């Protein structure tokens, strides 16, 4: 059995893609938490790859990564009573930073667990 067949065999559910309305709701929810980041193009890469290439520059996001969008959306979708208890995540990277910043901006207590190595 090949590696790809093994992976395919282990997939047990289908991913439900968000609808356009879901994306618009998320955009409205997180709007005050994120920077609007540019989309750039490269005519050099377009020619080499023979297609149009777009770069969404999420490195200009608050804390420097797209994770800010998901973290802030997750917090803002949570039940207000649950948020009073605070939030927690286990991450040593961009998601930890995004949860910490989103929580701070929302006045929510956050616990970030980071590995030692």
Feature map (PLM): residue ranges:
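PLP-dependent amino-acid enzyme catalytic core
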Residues: 2-117
């Amino acid at each position: 059995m090949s590696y790809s067949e093994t992976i395919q065999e282990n997939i047990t559910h289908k991913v439900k893609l968000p609808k356009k309305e879901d994306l618009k709701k998320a955009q409205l929810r997180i709007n005050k938490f994120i920077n609007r980041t540019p989309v750039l193009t490269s005519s050099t890469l377009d020619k080499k790859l023979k297609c149009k290439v777009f770069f969404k520059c999420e490195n200009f996001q608050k804390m420097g990564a797209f994770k800010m969008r998901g973290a802030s959306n997750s917090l803002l979708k949570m039940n207000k009573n649950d948020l009073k208890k605070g939030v927690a995540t286990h991450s040593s990277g961009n998601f930890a930073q995004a949860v910490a910043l989103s929580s701070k901006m929302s006045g929510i207590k956050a616990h970030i667990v980071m590995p030692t190595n």
